Amino acid sequence: MAIGKRLKKAREGIDREKLYPIAEAIKLIKDRATSKFDETIEIAMNLGVDPRHADQMVRGVVTLPNGTGRTLRVGVFARGAKAEEAKAAGADVVGAEDLVETVQGGTIAFDRCIATPDMMPLVGRLGKVLGPRGMMPNPKIGTVTMDVAGAVKGAKGGSVEFRVEKAGIVQAGIGKASFSEEKLVENVKALADAVAKAKPAGAKGTYIQRIAVSSSMGPGVKVEPGTVLG
C-alpha cells in the first residue's frame, strides 16, 4: 500500500480538530502503527516562547520511567581514569584528540556526546559539527560532567534530551509502538513534566500551548494538555 493511502486510511476515525485525553490519543496511534518495524511514538509540544531570545530557551534532560526502546550509542571525551570509567559504564566510543580527529573527519559513531570539563576546550573545536545536530556537550543537561559513568548509564537507560526548536516546538521520542499504553502515557507525562519545570524566566502567557502525539509513519493526534500536565 502506498504511503499516501496508508496515511489516509490511518486518519480514519481521528477527529483532527478534537483534543483527546492522552490515554485515548495513545490508543489511537498505537492501533494505527501497523508498519513492519516497531514504530517510534513521538510527542510534539508547542511552547509560548521565542528561542531566539536567550531568556526563552528551553533545554533539559529527563529519564523516562519506561525507557525509550532505543539503544543509544554514547561517545565520551575523557582521558585517563575518567576514560576508563566511561568504558566500564558501557560507552561505545571513548577518546580525546583521536576522537576529535575522527569526528572532524566526518565519522560520528555516537548519538549522545558526553565530556569531562577539562576536555571542553578541545571539544569546542567540534562546535560546527556537533552543534547543528544538538549533540554539543552542555553542563546544563549533565553532558559536561566528572560523573561520566553516571551520565553514560543515564543515556543508556532511557534519558531523553529535549530542546526547543526555532518554531517554539519541543519534539522527542517517548517509546515504541510495542510499549503498553500505560507505559507510553507514563513516559509522556514524565517528559511533559520536565518541559514544564524547564519553563524559562522570559516565557510570557500560556507556556505549553499545544500537544500532539504520533507514530513514525502515522497521523498526529491532538491532546488535551490538562490530561498530561499536573
From Swiss-Prot:
GO terms for biological process: regulation of translation; translation. It comes from Nitrobacter hamburgensis (strain DSM 10229 / NCIMB 13809 / X14). Part of the 50S ribosomal subunit. SUPFAM superfamilies: Ribosomal protein L1. The gene is rplA. Belongs to the universal ribosomal protein uL1 family. GO terms for cellular component: cytosolic large ribosomal subunit. Binds directly to 23S rRNA. The L1 stalk is quite mobile in the ribosome, and is involved in E site tRNA release. This is Large ribosomal subunit protein uL1. Disulfide bonds: none annotated. PANTHER family: 54S RIBOSOMAL PROTEIN L1, MITOCHONDRIAL, LARGE RIBOSOMAL SUBUNIT PROTEIN UL1M. Keywords: Repressor, Ribonucleoprotein, Ribosomal protein, RNA-binding, rRNA-binding, Translation regulation, tRNA-binding.
